[in-house]
């Protein structure tokens, strides 16, 4: 299913010097977000910084949200992940997309202008209305918590 989302370019290099986000393959769930930087920045081990993407989006559909996720290669090969682990973009947000990048690795990592630093996935949203009850209808699991369902 394809859904149109309003995108505003807030840095004129996006679409010129830096490509617009696209799906890499027909089966891709995520769009890559790029570092919209004037010059490379060095992220020392343990440091976190906020990186602009040069884009603002307005989803405008309360049935959708976007999540910003780490790119698997950056995390696995370099220890570079998101500072907030997952970013949530609400449907009514209209500001620039910023990516909190955290170097949890042991080596300094250089983020180059235009480098793909995160990915954005659009997800359906269900807003819940709470129904207060005294007790729940019994289930097989009940109150079993962490690890209760086993490993095999």
Swiss-Prot record:
Transmembrane segments: none annotated. Keywords: Hydrolase, Magnesium, Metal-binding, Nucleotide metabolism. InterPro entries: dUTPase, dUTPase-like, dUTPase-like_sf, dUTPase_trimeric. SUPFAM superfamilies: dUTPase-like. GO terms for biological process: dUMP biosynthetic process; dUTP catabolic process. GO terms for molecular function: dUTP diphosphatase activity; magnesium ion binding. It comes from the Bacteria. Pfam families: dUTPase (PF00692). Its cofactor is Mg(2+). Substrate binds at residues 71-73, 84, 88-90, 98. Its EC number is 3.6.1.23. It catalyses: dUTP + H2O = dUMP + diphosphate + H(+). The keyword Lyase does not apply. Pathway: Pyrimidine metabolism; dUMP biosynthesis; dUMP from dCTP (dUTP route): step 2/2. CDD domains: trimeric_dUTPase. Belongs to the dUTPase family. This enzyme is involved in nucleotide metabolism: it produces dUMP, the immediate precursor of thymidine nucleotides and it decreases the intracellular concentration of dUTP so that uracil cannot be incorporated into DNA. This is Deoxyuridine 5'-triphosphate nucleotidohydrolase. It comes from Pectobacterium carotovorum subsp. carotovorum (strain PC1). The lineage of its organism: Bacteria, Pseudomonadati, Pseudomonadota, Gammaproteobacteria, Enterobacterales. The gene is dut.
């Amino acid at each position: 299913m394809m859904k149109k989302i309003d995108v505003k370019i807030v840095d004129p290099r996006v679409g010129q010097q830096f490509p617009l986000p696209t799906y890499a393959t027909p089966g891709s769930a995520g769009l890559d977000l790029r570092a919209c930087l004037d010059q490379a920045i060095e992220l020392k081990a343990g440091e976190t910084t906020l990186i602009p993407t040069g884009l603002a989006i307005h989803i405008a559909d309360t049935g959708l949200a976007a999540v910003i996720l780490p790119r698997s290669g950056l995390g696995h090969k370099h220890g570079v992940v998101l500072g907030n682990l997952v970013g949530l973009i609400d449907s009514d947000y209209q500001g620039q997309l910023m990516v909190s990048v955290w170097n949890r690795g042991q080596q300094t990592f250089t983020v180059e202008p235009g480098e793909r630093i995160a990915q954005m996935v659009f997800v359906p949203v269900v807003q819940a209305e709470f129904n207060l009850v005294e007790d729940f209808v019994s289930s097989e699991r009940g109150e079993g918590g962490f690890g209760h369902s086993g490993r095999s």
